[in-house]
């Protein structure tokens, strides 16, 4: 009987289960959406039990639809929406509050207080992160502050904290193990990425009891086996875990220092492998742990772009300029250029390297000759300009010049965008055959732990190129276009 690896990809809007074979090819996939809760403006929450239910449902679906028996699963790898925070009762397994999602801004007030007390440099130095509502630490504090008796119960060891990987491993193992991996721990604002331990000083500042924190383990290791009653009577090794963006870096086989990937989803997340050194950023990048494997930890620099694919959705749903996302490519290619039009899609502010949450979207360079095609092209080009902004500071911080960019995510199907991206960066852009790189990364991490794959070299050799986009633009034009973009961003930031 053939053996397969099962990846659980627990995302922000849906949970997916994907079966991979030995060649790293997708055998079958199942997906289930779950409810988003918005109790107040800017707040985003999930029901952790509903997430768990959705994971069980997709596991059942993928096995039955693919006609794969549970005993044919060699191991399970988990990848997850990062930073999203769950606090639950150790005895009952019941969450004491909804999961607070990474996007949620409900702890912005706590962050402002911490920054006002001058704690930002301390957190930055120890965790590689900024004090921001994005990360888990202030979310745990919020739950402990707002649920009656929670802090006292946490101190007595009655409550457990976890990011979604921890919650799912705990549930799948029947409550036997309370663990996270290095990559997820590095997103909590409580983990020292240099000593590789929960940091007592930071926990003290946040008022989070150490007793509730999971044990931090490598990203590729057998943590536990599934409780038979959760996996059709079978005990399967749960053998790998990583946050979604780090898993994508692994799935793209970016194993050597200086290799980078960009995921074009709702937003963009760009990660560059910096090897065994944690590179401190001077330009608003995050320093994060890529993974812990083979007895060592490797680091990455990360840049975040808030609006990417959602700008294409805006053209479709908000402005009704296109009927499908694919139409954007057709219209963009009908014109030679944007005719001087720039769209700055700062709908919710700008991320790396600007970190300005007040700035709003703007359009510049409109004339009587501007058409729908120019506007659509300018919107697509904005994704590439924002990517160049991030890569420019990555190169400056790391001292590494990028030689190629590997890409994944929904928007990479757009050939116009990929060619323009290559032109603007002056490096080749590589699109892989398997676009589900996040799930593939989780499968690879678990597969290495159970011997399904032998080494990272085997995995790197499996990485298959679907199409390579080579730069065709001359330097003068590239400089002129990018200078125009920088001018547009400055103008947008001045208008508040």
UniProtKB/Swiss-Prot annotation:
The keyword Lipid biosynthesis does not apply. This is Glycerol kinase. It is an enzyme of class 2 (transferase). CDD domains: FGGY_EcGK_like. Glycerol binds at residues 82-83, 134, 244-245. Belongs to the FGGY kinase family. HAMAP family: Glycerol_kin. The phosphoenolpyruvate-dependent sugar phosphotransferase system (PTS), including enzyme I, and histidine-containing protein (HPr) are required for the phosphorylation of, which leads to the activation of the enzyme. One of its GO terms (molecular function) is ATP binding. ATP binds at residues 12-14, 266, 309, 313, 410. It catalyses: glycerol + ATP = sn-glycerol 3-phosphate + ADP + H(+). GO terms for biological process: glycerol catabolic process; glycerol metabolic process; glycerol-3-phosphate metabolic process. The modification Phosphohistidine is found at residue 230. Sn-glycerol 3-phosphate binds at residues 12, 82-83, 134, 244. SUPFAM superfamilies: Actin-like ATPase domain. Its EC number is 2.7.1.30. Inhibited by fructose 1,6-bisphosphate and p-chloromercuribenzoate (PCMB). Pathway: Polyol metabolism; glycerol degradation via glycerol kinase pathway; sn-glycerol 3-phosphate from glycerol: step 1/1. The keyword Transferase applies. Thermostable. The gene is glpK. It comes from the Bacteria. Keywords: ATP-binding, Glycerol metabolism, Kinase, Nucleotide-binding, Phosphoprotein, Transferase. The lineage of its organism: Bacteria, Thermotogati, Deinococcota, Deinococci, Thermales. GO terms for cellular component: cytosol. InterPro entries: ATPase_NBD, Carb_kinase_FGGY, Carb_kinase_FGGY_CS, FGGY_C, FGGY_N, Glycerol_kin. Key enzyme in the regulation of glycerol uptake and metabolism. Catalyzes the phosphorylation of glycerol to yield sn-glycerol 3-phosphate. ADP binds at residues 12, 16, 266, 309, 410, 414.
